[in-house]
Structures are given as structure tokens and as C-alpha cells.
A protein has these predicted regions:
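Domain-scale recognition of functional cores that engage charged ligands
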Residues: 8-10, 29-32, 36-378, 387-388, ...
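OB-fold and OB-like single-stranded nucleic-acid-recognition modules
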Residues: 291-292, 312, 316, 326-505
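Polybasic, low-complexity association/targeting segments
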Residues: 1-34
């Protein structure tokens, strides 16, 4: 099935033939749906701290970050902005020349409100000897869009989201990359330093480095901080093979195998190389201007405080279990912590012998830990917090995407639809064990939680294998705590017109 040429191509990517055969088998057989106990809710898997508790956790975080621990802000930023402009690309090829759809009208009616307006105007003058207003008056709407999206203009159709101008300020507009630098200074710093790591695509790496080089010093001075900015790319070894509809390997026109990026779950390899005590994770496009950053900063400190508080308890319990000297009451206390604080429940725990119980508790405590902010469901697309069964029969908190739900199971579909909260990708993670060693994060992935999607290339249908999502199956075997955070902390930009929302103005 695989030729000598195929094997060479496979090894050049850092993949083994066995991995390719396993992926083809997964594409053919699909993935099992997860067994779900319930959608998480407040009091059943989601912790909603009150004002006093929030202050306590902020204080815990302030104390922890002042003790010299290494904190890193990890930002997945490889996404191209092309999807943001899908509607405008459609306008460019439409058989009409004036804004017709509601989206097109909203864009042009409010074009002066965008942070990129001055740069766009300059490009229009350079290419068409007219400003945006004049081109609109002349009915040359498509020229305006071309100057925004195409290489002759600002090239926003090809740039990464992280480098587009999002927000207006008196001292000039800011990109999401800059907003993340500011956030790092405000909640993810320690000892006068802020470490921030962007995962970027190979094509955009130099652009990011250039922009950071231009901007970092300004924010260092403004916030009296030193930034350590690093970058990594998604590894080719995490790409997955594409298949034809009959499950045979899909081949390019030159006969080579087609490999595709395996989705954001591949970033576990990048995260695994981060040496830090605490890692904040948030998507590149979920940023707001300074005037409403306070609530984001507050709740980042809250969830970080909850993390370091829970981690300290877990470490203390592990050290106690290591001594071999503990009382029945202490074991009961550890069981309560594992079941109530970490949400790991084993229905037949009382049937375990003493030695088995200690092994079980050690196993459940000694793993990476994450606190996930979740927001009230307002109909935004995305995954949600659930309580799910694991292979060992235990139940634990998991973030599920709709693709992981069995659509033929009416009860599960109802749980997903009626879920009170959803996942805005607001995580803070602890990736070291109680002896100070880094966990090997790929060991904690549930490999049975990927999914198959239908795509096409050059008009030919294909099956694509998506790895378990970074905050889904890839962190399946982590200890997970869900915490309710305000909806105001979630302001993603999925289309260019989202920048017109009040939060981004």
C-alpha cells in the first residue's frame, strides 16, 4: 500500500509508517462517542466563587506570583485571518458592485470605526489616488475591499489574525498580539518579567518577530516590565494523513501523499516544551481594549489562584501518601478533595482495599492540572463543560465539542443543547509534578477522541483526521476544575464586523 517514495516522504515529516497505518485505521473505523453523565452546571461540576472567595484567590495568586515562580502566557496564534473576511471575499466575486447584504452594508456604513481605517485610506490613495470616502462616493466599493484584503493593499486576507489592527487608542491602533503583551504584564508577570509564547504558522513567523521587535519596548516602558517573547510552529510530525472516501490514502496530483495539519490538539507538543510552573492559555482573538480589561485581569487572577490553591493541596496529599503514615480521617479528607474539588468520582471507591485505594488516589492526584473558566451559554458556537465517563469507569470533568456527541442519543443532544455554560478557551494550567518535574503531556491524551471531517482539495473530496482538540481529548486525563467567569471576559472576533461591537470600540 505504501511505496518506497511514500516511506521516504513519511520519515521526512518525523512520522512512522505505523502511525500512518494507525491513522488510516482510525479514518476507516471512526471514533467512539463519549459516555456522558451530565452537562456540568453550578453545584454539579462548576464552581461559582462569590466576591469574598474571588478576593481570597486573587490574594493567593498575588502571593504565588511574587515568590519567583515561572509563569508563561501561551497564545495559539497560527490562525490566518481569511475566515474573518469570508463575506468580503464573497463581495469581491459577486455579480453586483454595491453593498447588498446586511453584512456588506454594516461594513461600509461603519468603515470609519475600524482601527485599520487610516492604513486602509493610505493604501487607497497609494493605489487609486483616492481616499476611502472618495472611492465610496464613486461607487468603487470593490476597490476599497481589494485594498484591504489583497497583496497590493494591506493583505489582510492573508495575514494572521494576531497582526491585524483591532483596537483604536490615542497613541495609535493595536493588534491582538500587542493586547496579549499588555495582558501578560497585567496578570502573568513575576519578578518584573512577563513570559509570552506564541504558536504561529511558518509563513507568519518572521512577520510576528518583526512586529514584536517594533512594539515590545514601548509596552515594557509603559508597564515597567521586561518581556521574554518566544515562538514555536506546529510540528510536521503532528500532521495527519488524508484519505479518499474509500479510506485509501489521498494522493496529490504528483502522486505524493497528502498530509494536513491535525488541528489545535497538535499544540500539546509545543506546550510540552514550555518550562513553567503556571501557563495561561487564551486564543489570539479574544482580547479587549484597556478600558474594559479590568474584569478580564481580575478573573484571570481568580482562576490562577484557584489553580495554585488546589495544586498545593494535591502536592501536600501526595507527600503525605509517600510517607506511608496517615490516619483514616486523612484518607477520607483526600477522597473528598479528589471527588469534590477535582470532580473525579469513582462509584465503587468503597470497595477498594486500603493499598488499592492509596494507589488510586496517588494516580488521580499526580497528573497535570487545569482550571477552565466557563461562561453562561448565550448561544455562541463551541464546546461545553461536561461530566464524562473514563475508560476506568470513573467520572471526571471534560470539555466536549459537538462532534464528540452522539447525535442519535436524544438525551445527550438535549444535554448539549440545554447546557448552562460553554467553553470560551480560558485556561490556566500547572504542568509540573509534586517533585518539581515536568509532566510528559502527550501521556495524558485520550487518543480515542479525535474526529473525521469532510474536506476537499482541487475539487476532490477527502476525509481529514483531526487530532483530539487541545482543551478537549488532548487534556482528557488532566485534573480539571470548571469555574464560572463573567461573559464580559469573552469577546472573540470571528468576522471583521465583530470589531464593530461595542466591546471592541
Amino acid at each position: 500500500m505504501l511505496s518506497k517514495q511514500d516511506l521516504n516522504q513519511i520519515s521526512q515529516r518525523g512520522i512512522t509508517p505505523e502511525m500512518v497505518q494507525h491513522q488510516l485505521k482510525q479514518i476507516k473505523e471512526g471514533f467512539p462517542f463519549l459516555k456522558i453523565e451530565a452537562a456540568a452546571s453550578i453545584g454539579n461540576g462548576i464552581f461559582a466563587p462569590n466576591k469574598e472567595e474571588c478576593q481570597k484567590y486573587v490574594d493567593d495568586w498575588t502571593k504565588y506570583s511574587g515568590e519567583g515562580h515561572k509563569v508563561v502566557k501561551f497564545v495559539p496564534a497560527s490562525g490566518a485571518a481569511s475566515r474573518m473576511f469570508k463575506n468580503l471575499f464573497a463581495f469581491l466575486t459577486a455579480d453586483y458592485d454595491v453593498p447588498t447584504t446586511d453584512f456588506e452594508k454594516e461594513f461600509f456604513d461603519n468603515i470609519k470605526k475600524f482601527a485599520f481605517k487610516h492604513e486602509l485610506c493610505n493604501k487607497c490613495k497609494e493605489n487609486d489616488d483616492a481616499c476611502v470616502c472618495d472611492l465610496k462616493k464613486e461607487g468603487k466599493y470593490k476597490e476599497v475591499v481589494a485594498n484591504l484584503l489583497e497583496t497590493k493593499g494591506l493583505n489582510y486576507g492573508q495575514l494572521p489574525k494576531g497582526l491585524l489592527l483591532f483596537h483604536n487608542y490615542e497613541d495609535g491602533p493595536r493588534t491582538p498580539m500587542e493586547e496579549h503583551l499588555v495582558e501578560a504584564a497585567l496578570y502573568a508577570s513575576s519578578n518584573g518579567e512577563a513570559n509570552i509564547h506564541f504558536t504561529v504558522s511558518h509563513d507568519h513567523l518572521d512577520l510576528f518577530k518583526k512586529k514584536v521587535g517594533e512594539k515590545a519596548a514601548y509596552y515594557e516602558k509603559k508597564y515597567n516590565i521586561h518581556f521574554n517573547v518566544s515562538f514555536s510552529e506546529q510540528k510536521p510530525s503532528t500532521d495527519t494523513i488524508a484519505a479518499n472516501t474509500d479510506n485509501t490514502p489521498f494522493r496529490n496530483e504528483d502522486g505524493t501523499l497528502l498530509f494536513r495539519p491535525g488541528g489545535h490538539g497538535a499544540l500539546i507538543e509545543n506546550l510540552n516544551e514550555i518550562d513553567a510552573d503556571v501557563v495561561f492559555i487564551k486564543n489570539i482573538d479574544n482580547v479587549v481594549p484597556d478600558r474594559i480589561k479590568d474584569i478580564t485581569v481580575l478573573y484571570k487572577k481568580v482562576i490562577a489562584g484557584i489553580l495554585v490553591d488546589a495544586q498545593k493541596k494535591a502536592f501536600d496529599y501526595l507527600r503525605l501518601l509517600d510517607t506511608g503514615v496517615y490516619s483514616h480521617e486523612q484518607i477520607e479528607e483526600i477522597i473528598r478533595f479528589v471527588q469534590q474539588n477535582l470532580g473525579n468520582r469513582k462509584h465503587d471507591i468503597k470497595e477498594l482495599e486500603d493499598a488499592e485505594l492509596v494507589i488510586y488516589l496517588k494516580n488521580k492526584l499526580n497528573r497535570p492540572m487545569r482550571v477552565c473558566g466557563v461562561v453562561k451559554n448565550v448561544g455562541e458556537p463551541g464546546g461545553g463543560p461536561f461530566l464524562c465517563y473514563n475508560a476506568d469507569g470513573t467520572v471526571s470533568p471534560q470539555i466536549l465539542e459537538s462532534s464528540q456527541i452522539d447525535k442519535n442519543n436524544e438525551e445527550y443532544v438535549k444535554m448539549f443543547k440545554d447546557g448552562t455554560h460553554f467553553n470560551p478557551v480560558d485556561l490556566v494550567c500547572a504542568t509540573k509534578d509534586y517533585k518539581g518535574n515536568r509532566f510528559h503531556l502527550p501521556d495524558f491524551v485520550d487518543r480515542s477522541t479525535g474526529f473525521i471531517s469532510s474536506k476537499s482539495k482541487n475539487g476532490r473530496e477527502l476525509k481529514a483526521l483531526e487530532l483530539p482538540g487541545l482543551w478537549n481529548g488532548t487534556m482528557s486525563d488532566w485534573n480539571t476544575i470548571f469555574v464560572e467567569v463573567p461573559i464580559e471576559t469573552f469577546n472573540p472576533v470571528k468576522t471583521v464586523n465583530d470589531l464593530l461591537r461595542e466591546q471592541h470600540q
